Amino acid sequence: MTGVAAPGAGPRPGSAVARRGGVLPLDKPAGITSFDAIRQVRRILGERRVGHAGTLDPTATGLLPICVGRSTRFVDYFHAQPKTYHCVVRLGERSDTGDTEGVIVAGADASSVRADQVRAELARFKGEIEQIPPMHSAVRHEGRHLYELARAGEEVARKPRRVTIYSAELVDFRPGAPAEAEMVVVSGKGAYMRVLAADLGDALGTGGLLAWLSRTSYGSLGLAASITLDQLEAMDDPWLALLPPEVAVAHLPLVNLGPAQVLQVRRGQSVWLPRSVLPNIAGECRMHDPTGELLGIGELNGGLLRPTKVLAG
């Protein structure tokens, strides 16, 4: 029967199902790039179709969702989901990269900065704000990554981008010269914690850099459900570490389809759904077959469901 259900990720798949693709909630260690992590996952799984959903800098740790197999079609859906970061901002120092990887220089004396001042300035960064992408980033300029230009000693003008900071809370403050502000930040797509650290330091008049960062959640995924590369390597069947592809799209409304409708969708045909079983929604939704397995993504408009991404059966 056709109907609508609440979002959910579903159970962890068995090995046979997992080998068709899924999401690996990797706990990335410090000292490797996100692409280094991808290379290791490809080697361990013996699968070429592997892609991550949002870069973590080499010094950063934490949750790096990796889409495997047919789930790589859903990487972009992760980007729209909020991310939570636990980070430490060092006040009284600056860096050309915005973190500890770059050339660190002294800022202004931060010994007089108080926790209430940090909270007050941090509150100004909540909501929609503008950030200028750092030179050491994957943003492209005339076909080249900014980090490539930075490594060549070039600096180019970058346009500010609008990003969203849903919340930013100071959880600890360690006064001194330099001082350290420990924070938990929930952000939307495209927000740079390095830029937030530098901008916060500028607002306080001391300068600032990102001293430490860990991503603790990404959409419906939490760090508690993640797995390290060493743990993955030690598994008899590492494919069992994969979560269902639905994890990437669990934030979308769910439409359950009957057998005849599934056949239409698999042929790429649109399906009319009875208004009596649909909520007042429009836009993207995820589709389930009668067994509860993810069929793909569709666009719902006035009762007409148009399939846009359909997983192979």
Residue ranges of predicted features:
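Accessory RNA 3′-end/elbow-binding domains used by RNA modification enzymes
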Residues: M1-P25, P29-H52, L56, A60, ...
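The conserved catalytic core of RNA pseudouridine synthases
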Residues: R43-E47, P65, E155-V195, D199-G205
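Glycine/acidic-rich beta-strand-loop module
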Residues: L45, R49-H79, E148
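Residue-level signal for inorganic ion chemistry
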Residues: I66, C87, G143, L196, ...
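Structural signature of FAD isoalloxazine-binding scaffolds in flavoprotein oxidoreductases
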Residues: D76-L91, V156-L170
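Acidic, low-complexity central loop/insert segments
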Residues: Y77-Q131
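Short, structured loop/turn "capping" segments at alpha-beta junctions
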Residues: E128-P133, A177, R194, T206-W212
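Extended alpha-helical targeting/anchoring segments
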Residues: S137, H141-I165
